[in-house]
């Protein structure tokens, strides 16, 4: 593996992004060997990562939104190599990047390639991996059903608008949650199982989550009496509902839902009646800003 070889896996819709082109050119002018591959359809990111690992690339850059980031991160982790991950946030929500303190400007984001990569955890559920968060309940449906055109025009506010227009469909989910020293059963409106802190366009469901603590943060919003009003508050930023959440920090979590539970894994839908969530400590090395809020400690000196 050549430690200087970097490959940017770029979402196809960003191929004409002039800021990205300028940032890539600046990195090359500074002496970095930076190649670019563009995705076109589902599965491309995984295939490109596999080919890059076989070709000896030392670092992969995920250029896109949270979905692209999840695909690249999962493929890297399954490759079980030494390659690291950098993040070029180009989506609508960019939830993981925002929580981690990664700049949204392409040049500043690519400058993090100079930061030492830190080992971070990945979440897993029923054989699938996720970098940021698994969400369930009404919130996962909002995220999954928010159109790409609406997100392009309104940005993160698109999630709020979609939620508001779907109030007539609101109904609570029912589940039983089991983990070491944690048991909860009942109806809930929203669920977050976080490696990261926020999802769905800026909704901070797991405010204390860290990506290097070997644990998952669980946040359950039990069904309140004023369900529609509470949902509006949650989608509008969450102020005023913090005290309603049931929270835990666990190495694994089992969820049983007799009627099935819709879960969103960083943009990928999953449904099941029995789900087991776990964490893979230090599964991936990622270039994060010094002092990132998602890290527990500064890097060790070699």
From Swiss-Prot:
Cofactor(s) required, per the database record: Mg(2+); Ca(2+)
Binding residues annotated for Mg(2+), in chain numbering: 210, 213, 215
GO cellular component terms given for this protein: cytoplasm; plasma membrane
SMART domains, A to Z: DAGKc
GO terms (BP aspect): phospholipid biosynthetic process
Active site: 268
PROSITE patterns for the chain: DAGK (PS50146)
Enzyme Commission number(s): 2.7.1.-
Cofactor note: Binds 1 Mg(2+) ion per subunit. Ca(2+) may be able to substitute.
Pfam short name (any one): DAGK_cat
Residues in DAGKc domain copies: 1-129
UniProt-annotated location(s): Cytoplasm
MF GO annotations: ATP binding; lipid kinase activity; magnesium ion binding
Entry keyword set: ATP-binding, Cytoplasm, Kinase, Lipid biosynthesis, Lipid metabolism, Magnesium, Metal-binding, Nucleotide-binding, Phospholipid biosynthesis, Phospholipid metabolism, Transferase
Record flagged with keyword NADP: no
Residues that bind ATP: 39, 65-71, 92
InterPro entries assigned: ATP-NAD_kinase_N, Diacylglycerol/lipid_kinase, Diacylglycerol_kinase_cat_dom, Lip_kinase_YegS, Lipid_Phosphate_FormReg, NAD/diacylglycerol_kinase_sf, YegS/DAGK_C
Parts forming coiled coils: none
Family the entry assigns: Belongs to the diacylglycerol/lipid kinase family. YegS lipid kinase subfamily.
NCBIfam families: lip_kinase_YegS, PRK13054.1, YegS/Rv2252/BmrU family lipid kinase
Protein function: Probably phosphorylates lipids; the in vivo substrate is unknown.
Designated name of the protein: Probable lipid kinase YegS-like
Originating species: Pseudomonas aeruginosa (strain UCBPP-PA14)
